[in-house]
Regions:
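Active-site-proximal substrate-binding core of FAD-dependent oxidoreductases
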Residues: 469-487
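A conserved FAD-binding loop/helix module that cradles the flavin
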Residues: 446-467
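A glycine-rich dinucleotide-binding beta-alpha-beta segment and adjacent secondary-structure elements
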Residues: 170-185, 333-338, 385-449
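Mid-domain catalytic core of redox enzymes
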Residues: 236-350
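Rossmann-like flavin
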Residues: 92-191
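N-terminal glycine-rich phosphate/pyrophosphate-binding loop and immediately adjacent elements
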Residues: 2-130
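Flavin-binding catalytic cores
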Residues: 116, 296-297, 330-333, 367-406
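Helical element adjacent to the flavin cofactor pocket in flavoenzyme catalytic cores
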Residues: 200-241
Length: 487
């Protein structure tokens, strides 16, 4: 039996596994699916030669998170491609908000709100590493840079409150910010959504939202290659039924949802902790629709053709109304649709002349409805003629999401509702959210701080506790990652 068993091969599980292996421990990773990668996988879902990302498609954190800055994906063979436009937000009438990687260019395009956009983001972009370090922390200690933390916090409070329109005079800039805040799958005028929006929009102007050449699978593949180089082992197609399977391991690290911990632990968990896990709420879901296309999407608004990611919902008011409908358990007639067009930078995703379009729409948790018609209508709204380009499509409803990734309960790709309480206390109120009451058993999924995203930081924080508590190793995980070629 190895020193450590990791259950789940998503980016957090693999991040923990690599850190623990770099510390000299023997590590085995078990994955229920036939392929590894969790929320960062790529497959031919529509037609041969059309490669689609199964969940995560654009990666703001691949260049930014402390884990990936130390691991250095490029040094491990991953080519990260940055579109000139990180994201765009088309509006009716053929206009769009365009988040260029260049902050000044973005502000120049925003008319009367350009100065407000620059004032909102310039201090954040200038100190982007400190912003990321704060947002990607375990939320249990004060920020190292108090001034940047204060500036960021005040901006989040503003955008998460009734004051959110105070600095804006037109519709484009607030829509551009709301589109990214709505990644949280919650009404965007809320603190957790505002925090996500401020962080991701900052990164749009600080390195960009990169796409790995060949697909998101390149990220877990690089982590797996490093794990195996260090002597670690990956086992796919193995659904863990009970923690008792690994009784000889000194530590078990779970890149799983709280519901999976409850299942695998059986009656071993103390009542108070088990009740806390059962109270953990899962939020709105995603209905994923992937398209194989005969050509590029014919966006009406200039700038959209250069964007890696687009948010299709309309104005800030329309986004708020759509998300309130989802939160009430109903389907929106015009749902929020997130679209990614990898072909703007990566021609390997489709045969010559072809393109892929990744989309998902927000739906109520557990929804079994195929809403591809509503998705197509939202794309067609801003790109007339899109329908004529569709060669094939693949739909995964919210209810079907857990069959692809067991952490997405009811289709919740955030692995837990992004409420204010669950923003700080994931999955239960504990000073150490990674340790469970079971000796040697830890959680490292997106259901722990800092939450969803391909960043590896939940895995890093959990690995730090495993090293210190179970093995008496106090070396900083980031130092382990920076050590060249450890034996």
């Amino acid at each position: 039996m190895p020193d450590v068993v990791v259950v789940g091969s998503g980016p957090n599980g693999l991040a923990a596994a690599v850190i623990l292996a770099r510390a000299g421990l023997t590590v085995e990773v078990y994955e229920a699916q036939a392929t590894a990668g969790g929320g960062s996988r790529t497959a031919e879902l529509t037609l041969p030669g059309y490669r689609h990302d199964v969940c995560a498609g654009a990666h703001p954190m691949a260049l930014a998170s402390p884990f990936f800055r130390a691991f250095d994906l490029a040094a491990h063979g991953v080519e990260l491609l940055a579109p000139e436009v990180s994201y765009a937000h088309p509006l009716d009438g053929g206009t769009a908000g365009v988040a260029w990687r260049d902050l000044d260019r973005t502000a120049a395009d925003l008319g009367r709100d350009g100065a407000a956009w620059r004032a909102l983001f310039e201090p954040m972009v200038r100190h982007w590493q400190q912003v990321v370090d704060l947002a990607m922390s375990d939320l249990r200690r004060p920020p190292a840079d108090l001034l940047t933390g204060l500036r960021f916090g005040l901006r989040v409070l503003e955008q998460g409150s009734p004051l959110w329109n105070l600095r804006f005079r037109e519709q484009t800039a607030p829509a551009l910010l709301t589109g990214v805040a709505t990644h949280a799958i919650t009404p965007p005028r809320a603190i957790p959504a505002a925090g996500a929006g401020m962080l991701l929009a900052t990164l749009a102007h600080a390195g960009g939202w990169v796409l790995p050449r060949g697909g998101s699978q390149a990220i877990p593949d690089a982590l797996i290659a490093e794990l195996e180089r260090l002597g670690g082992k990956l086992v796919t197609g193995h659904r863990v039924e009970s923690l008792d399977e690994f009784g000889g391991a000194r530590a078990i690290v779970l890149d799983t949802a709280p519901a999976e911990l409850l299942r695998m632990a059986g009656d071993r968990l103390p009542d108070h902790y088990a009740k806390g896990l059962r109270r953990f709420r899962y939020g709105g879901a995603a209905c994923k629709v992937d398209f194989a296309l005969s050509g590029p999407v014919p966006w009406r608004a200039p700038g959209c053709e250069l964007a890696g990611t687009l948010h299709l919902v309309g104005t800030r008011a329309e986004a708020m109304a759509a998300e309130k409908t989802i939160a009430a358990g109903q389907h929106a007639d015009r749902p929020y649709v997130l679209a990614i067009q990898p072909g703007v930078v990566d021609p390997t995703r489709a045969p010559a002349g072809g393109h892929t379009l990744y989309t998902y729409a927000h739906v109520p948790n557990g929804s079994a409805r195929d809403i591809s018609a509503a998705v197509i209508a939202q794309v067609e709204r801003f790109a007339p003629g899109f329908t004529d380009l569709i060669l094939a499509k693949n739909v995964v409803t919210g209810a079907e999401m857990p069959t692809h990734n067991a952490n997405y309960i009811g289709g919740d790709i955030s692995a837990g509702a992004m409420t204010l309480r669950q923003f700080a206390f994931r999955p239960v109120p504990r000073w150490n959210p990674y340790a469970t009451p079971l000796p040697g058993v830890y959680l490292c999924s997106a259901s722990t701080p800092p939450g969803p995203g391909v960043h590896g930081m939940s895995g890093l924080h959990a690995a730090r506790h495993v090293l210190r508590t179970e093995f008496g190793i106090h070396t900083d995980p980031l130092d382990l990652l920076r050590t060249p070629n450890p034996a």
